[in-house]
A protein has these predicted regions:
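Short loop/turn segments at strand-loop or loop-helix junctions that form parts
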Residues: 92-97, 174-175
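Short acidic, S/G/P-rich loop/turn micro-motifs used as interaction or catalytic elements
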Residues: 97-101, 157-159
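Solvent-exposed, flexible loop/coil residues
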Residues: 146-148, 177, 247
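Aromatic/basic-lined ligand-recognition segments
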Residues: 131-168, 183
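Compact mixed alphabeta submodule
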Residues: 155-197
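"Short basic amphipathic alpha-helical interaction patches in structured regions
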Residues: 105-112, 164-169
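Non-catalytic accessory regions used for complex assembly or targeting
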Residues: 1-85, 91, 99, 107-126, ...
């Protein structure tokens, strides 16, 4: 059974876990908490050091077991997230066999959306009324168990976009309420955006991706930010979101 962890718990009990889990968490800590302070996501770095983040380990994302484990972890996380701190985020590490590690980035993207589709099918709670059903609406966000999440995916196939590279498949689920003070309408949010973009330019070997915009911006589509390309290519305006699980609901 998958378990939800705090950093403080993992620091004390890491050696009791499987080797790949030890390696994943260790490498995450080295990346986010690097001594040179280069990791571009400042809120994520703050959340790591303040123990606001929660962690989970699941199986290969291509299997049904991973979907079931992720569903249970997100249910548990939804019940405690607001008590973890202002930089809350759930970090999920996926077991990543060698054959998957060697896959092209397109395969990872396909598997990412397949996982979200299958995860939605496990959802027992109605889609929140305040979140649009259409992914192409600028206020759409992925939801599970009644909670809206901004999601980002990192993979071994991301090479140039170092900020999205990780030796295992890793997904971060950030509750939408985290951004109530951290958005384009607040001075704090504006300053943070400028700082993160500056750090991204120094960290990645490609420019800041053009899809990275604020939630609520009429030109923004959250789904395009979930899985970024390894280059500067932006999906065309006519591109359709791979998440189609809500199609029938939209027709009602």
């Amino acid at each position: 059974m998958a378990q939800l962890y705090a950093k403080s718990c993992l620091d004390q009990n890491l050696r009791s876990l499987e080797e790949w889990k030890q390696d994943a968490f260790t490498q995450f800590g080295e990346m986010v908490g690097d001594e040179a302070d280069t990791f571009p996501c400042v809120p994520g770095r703050q959340g790591f050091f303040l123990d606001h983040l929660r962690y989970g380990f699941v199986g290969d994302l291509r299997g049904d077991g991973a979907v079931n484990e992720l569903a249970e972890l997100l249910k548990e996380y939804q019940g405690c997230a607001k008590q973890t701190g202002q930089y809350a985020s759930f970090i999920c590490f996926f077991e990543t066999p060698q054959d998957l590690k060697e896959s092209p980035i397109e395969e990872f993207e396909q598997q990412f959306w397949s996982l979200l589709q299958r995860l939605h099918q496990k959802d027992e709670v109605p889609w929140p009324a305040e979140i649009p059903l259409d992914p192409h609406h600028h206020e759409w966000e992925y939801c599970f168990h009644g909670e809206a999440y901004f999601i980002l995916c990192s993979t071994p196939a991301h090479k140039l976009r170092k900020s999205r590279h990780f030796p295992y498949v890793m997904m971060a689920f950030q509750p939408r309420w985290v951004f109530e003070k951290l958005n384009g309408s607040t001075k704090f949010g504006q300053k943070m955006s400028q700082l993160v973009r500056k750090r991204l330019k120094a960290y990645d070997q490609v420019d800041v991706h053009p899809s990275l915009k604020w939630y609520g911006d009429p030109t923004n589509h959250e789904w395009k930010q979930y899985f970024l390309s390894d280059d500067e290519a932006e999906k065309p305006a006519s591109a359709k979101c791979p998440f189609t699980a809500l199609k029938n609901m939209m027709k009602l």
